[in-house]
Amino acid sequence: MNQREKLSQLQKVSQVLLDVKLLVLDKAARARQASLDHLAELNRPSPPTDLDPVIAAEVSVRYQNWADQRRSAINLDLARQTAEWADARRDAALAFGRNAVIGKLRGRVD
């Protein structure tokens, strides 16, 4: 196997690795975005319109208590997801760089 064939094989492997890293990054980004969307939804409650004002206030207080608990849980998930997303982003960037360098080397040999 000559140098051209070796670089060709190496670029194929590098491309597969890049594709895998990009899929992992996409999955992490979608999970993180879902948590961000859930947080945004918690900030937009739809107030009941046909209730007595005292009952509506009680409903609002209970909703806020529940929403605060959900925010706490979502924020824990979001912190983990953000760390995973940052790691996946770094890994994808490295794979992209390696693939680009191998492509340039292959171009010089051809």
Task: Tell where the protein language model's regions lie, with residue ranges.
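Charge-rich amphipathic alpha-helical interaction elements
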Residues: 1-110
